[in-house]
């Protein structure tokens, strides 16, 4: 299966407009943003666990990274409420479930095998730090090699200078509305800016979004 699989191409998806697609596991539904492969694939997906749904033990052959968007996600190591950012390195395994139901943004098979650090962060407890420009704040989540992951906040009325994404960037809007020359992206929007692309983002009302860059190299 190939969905927005060409990493050299710009892509955008407005997930609230998508239908939920059943996975092979009962009560686990998906909105597929990008995918290159079968049931085990390099992918970016919004996954919904209905209350009581479970996913059996599985191994992360290329690593797993997720951000809990809503509800509480659980595995053998604990419970992860909304706002929790988690990285499971290549070769790790777990089973997963949600007693009350949850939604997560999950990225599979996108980690450097040399990156062996497990990460569990309560992003709500992190302080905002000054970003690259006035009106922009960041919460760094992880960095390894060329890969950088963070939350970014753009204050109302801020316009970011036109810039080039040398190594490519993905973002997922968590709150508010982001815009650029190509459109407007509300909560739940996902966008990929490929390596070498240029744009000038801004936000009239302010927004917060997840950012991952440098992982296309």
Residue ranges and their predicted role:
Residues 28-32, 39-73:
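The feature marks the first
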Residues 51, 60-75, 156, 165-181, ...:
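Glycine- and acidic-residue-biased ligand/ion/polar-headgroup-sensing regions
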Residues 55, 80, 86, 154, ...:
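Fold-core signature of tandem repeat domains
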Residues 75-93, 180-199:
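Short acidic-glycine-tyrosine-enriched beta hairpin
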Residues 130-175, 180:
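Surface-exposed interaction/gating patches
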């Amino acid at each position: 299966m190939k969905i927005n699989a060409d990493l050299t191409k710009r892509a955008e998806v407005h997930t609230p407009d998508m239908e939920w697609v059943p996975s092979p596991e009962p009560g686990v539904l998906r909105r597929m943003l990008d995918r290159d492969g079968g049931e085990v694939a390099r992918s970016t997906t919004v996954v919904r666990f209905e209350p009581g749904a479970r996913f059996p033990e599985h191994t992360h052959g290329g690593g797993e990274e997720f951000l809990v968007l809503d509800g509480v996600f659980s595995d053998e190591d604990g419970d992860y409420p909304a706002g929790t950012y988690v990285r499971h390195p290549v070769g790790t395994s777990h089973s997963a479930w949600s007693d009350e139901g949850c939604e997560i943004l999950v990225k599979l098979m996108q980690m450097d095998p040399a990156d062996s650090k497990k990460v569990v962060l309560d992003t709500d407890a992190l302080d905002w730090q000054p970003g690259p420009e006035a009106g922009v704040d960041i919460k760094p989540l992880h960095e390894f090699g060329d890969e950088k992951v963070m939350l970014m906040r753009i204050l109302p009325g801020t316009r970011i200078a036109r810039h080039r994404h040398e190594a490519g960037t993905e973002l997922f809007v968590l709150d508010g509305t982001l815009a650029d020359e190509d459109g407007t992206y509300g909560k739940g929007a996902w966008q990929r800016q490929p390596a070498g692309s240029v744009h000038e983002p801004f936000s009239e009302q302010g927004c917060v979004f997840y950012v991952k860059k440098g992982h296309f190299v």
